[in-house]
From Swiss-Prot:
Name recorded for this polypeptide: Potassium-transporting ATPase potassium-binding subunit
Keywords on record: Cell membrane, Ion transport, Membrane, Potassium, Potassium transport, Transmembrane, Transmembrane helix, Transport
Gene that encodes it: kdpA
Chief site of localization: membrane
Lineage: Bacteria, Bacillati, Bacillota, Bacilli, Bacillales
Family, per entry: Belongs to the KdpA family.
Subcellular location: Cell membrane
Length: 558
């Protein structure tokens, strides 16, 4: 019942919050202008931008240059961190390959962590590098999505200014909400301090070091920005990051807030005036929510069912291996599905200890990479499947392929197919390399089917810019650092470039007025068709490897 109430509340909150996002996205005046405008203008002066509207090509150039500059600075700071200030625990520099992986991971909103948060980064890099990139990577994804929506919806004839979009989103959305969430988490016991690690003497007489630091400030944007990188190695399973059931709900709600609001925002932009949500967006929301609930149900069923091997020995009950007692199997499964559906990557339980079908659910969500997804890019990925569905359905019934009165031609379809293929190609090719390259497979700690699942999960998490992992994998090696770094880089930027190209190509075409020869995208049957094509196309791509991984493991448990 608590899960149903939580999900219902989040749907209502995101629907209302999308109205505020609408005013932020379209640079409309609001009551908060007196608070934020001066700070925004100061940021624009520091950046040196004159807020001129950019072409799509210029927008992408500035997006890539901004991200490239941040990535370079991050890499440099990580390899010299031991000589900088705010290092009371005397942590050492990261190796070149690990710094490469870490910089790309946080730059691309993935937060795949091959390092130990307690010992491999300093307070300075946690705050200046990790926390800063959590803001900018999230805002970058939002900015390119808004640029795409402006063109697709025809609400304006401009794509916008990259720096204006990113600054407004950080100042008016991320910063206020992060401060609020940080305060809420601190009231639940999450630390926020620059004090060095505590050194205590245990009852047995041994000395123990307890790691903590400025956790609350990182924890808030970690979930709000769908980042996922933890201050501590145990992530949100540790009491310092996620002390109780209330902090657990705060963190889950933070993950869901912006991606769900973006879908409603799309509907408000389609309705032109923003006071209501267009039926097309509601159909998309219901379709994605249906997939989300289906996988949540499957995951919870598997985790409550427990391990059949133990059941045969007379030991019944849910699968509690790798889980925190304060959350139990139900809230652990919910957190797992949310963190993979919304591509956050934070964890409150050990995913490597999930049952085979329990691990299949989050893996499938990352393979689909469209069920709400991350900040901005999740909606962009969904729209690719929408365009693909419109095109196929139109040809199947002999109608004209068009979307929002824009005809879909050969050029757009080539880009759409490329975006669709990049994701599975990166996952499958690099997974195969992990088994072929000498030394790479030595990181696998489980034999047979589960070992394949470990590799597939790691590569899928990197390709989906998620960041969670089956942490039984020994991934801090040169191969895993470089390979997952390349995957995160390619899977983030190539689709974004192609998606903006698709939007620009569509709007440059002559408007096509909808008639009886076009597919109605605001009807329930379109939502059903979308679900079928998402499952069918992704299923044909990944079913063979899933049979070798979690499904094969499930069939062997008796």
């Amino acid at each position: 019942m608590e899960i149903i109430l939580f999900l219902t509340m989040m749907v209502m909150i995101t629907y209302v919050f999308s109205g505020y996002l609408y005013r932020v996205a379209l640079v409309q005046s609001s009551r908060v202008d007196l608070i934020f405008t001066r700070f925004e203008n100061m940021c624009f002066k520091i950046i040196g931008t004159d807020l001129e509207h950019m072409s799509a090509k210029t927008y992408v150039k500035h997006f890539l240059a901004f991200n490239g500059f941040m990535g370079f600075i991050t890499f440099v700071l990580l390899i010299v961190q031991q000589w900088l200030f705010l290092n009371p625990n005397h942590n050492l520099n990261q190796s070149i390959d690990l710094a490469f992986n870490t910089a790309i991971s946080f730059l691309t909103n993935s937060n795949l962590q091959h390092y130990n948060g307690e010992s491999d980064v300093t307070y300075l890099t946690q705050m200046i590098v990790m926390t800063y990139l959590m803001f900018t990577s999230s805002a970058s994804g939002y900015a390119v999505c808004i640029a795409m929506l402006r063109r697709l919806t025809g609400l304006t004839n401009i794509i916008g200014n990259f720096y204006q979009d990113i600054v407004r989103f950080i100042v008016r959305v991320l910063l206020p909400l992060s401060c609020l969430i940080s305060i809420l988490l601190m009231t639940q016991g999450v630390p926020q301090t620059l004090h060095a690690n505590l050194m205590i003497r245990t009852l047995s007489g041994h000395i123990q070091h307890i790691a903590f630091g400025p956790i609350a400030s990182l924890e808030s944007i970690k979930h709000l920005g769908t980042n996922g990188g933890g201050f501590l190695a145990g992530n949100s399973a540790t009491p310092f990051e996620n002390p109780n059931i209330w902090s657990n709900f705060i963190e889950m709600g933070s993950m869901m807030l912006l991606p769900m609001s973006m879908l409603f925002l799309f509907g408000r932009m389609l309705s032109r005036h923003g006071k209501r949500v267009h039926r097309h967006a509601l159909i998309l929301f219901v379709a994605m929510f249906f997939i989300f609930i289906a996988i949540l149900t499957l995951t919870m069923w598997s985790e409550y069912r427990g391990n059949p091997i133990l059941a045969n020995l007379g030991i019944y009950g849910p699968n509690m291996e790798g889980k925190e007692v304060r959350f139990g199997a139900g809230l652990s499964a919910l957190f797992t599905v949310i963190t993979t559906a919304f591509t956050t990557g934070s964890v409150n339980n050990m995913h490597d200890s999930l049952t085979p079908i329990g691990g299949l659910g989050p893996m499938v969500l990352m393979m689909l990479n469209v069920v709400f997804g991350g900040e901005g890019v999740g909606l962009m990925n969904l729209l690719i499947f929408v365009l693909l569905t419109v095109f196929i359905c139109s040809l199947m019934v002999g109608k004209t392929p068009e979307y929002l009165n824009m005809p879909i031609g050969a050029r757009e379809m080539k880009c759409i197919v490329l975006v669709f293929l990049i994701h599975p190609i990166l996952i499958l090719v690099f997974s195969a390399l992990a088994f072929m390259i000498p030394g790479a497979s030595e990181s696998i700690t489980n034999p047979s089917f589960h070992g394949i699942s470990q590799v597939m999960y790691e590569m899928t998490s990197a390709a989906a810019n998620n960041g969670s992992g089956f942490e039984g994998l020994k991934d801090d090696t040169t191969f895993w650092n470089i390979s997952t770094g390349i995957i995160m880089l390619l899977s983030r930027y190539i689709p974004i470039i192609l998606q903006l190209m698709i939007a620009s190509s569509l709007v440059n075409k002559k408007s096509y007025h909808q008639d009886k020869y076009t597919i109605a995208i605001d009807k329930p049957y379109f939502g059903v068709s979308l679900i079928v094509f998402i499952v069918l196309l992704s299923g044909l791509t990944f079913i063979p490897v899933l049979l070798l991984g979690p499904i094969g493991e499930f069939l062997t448990l008796k």
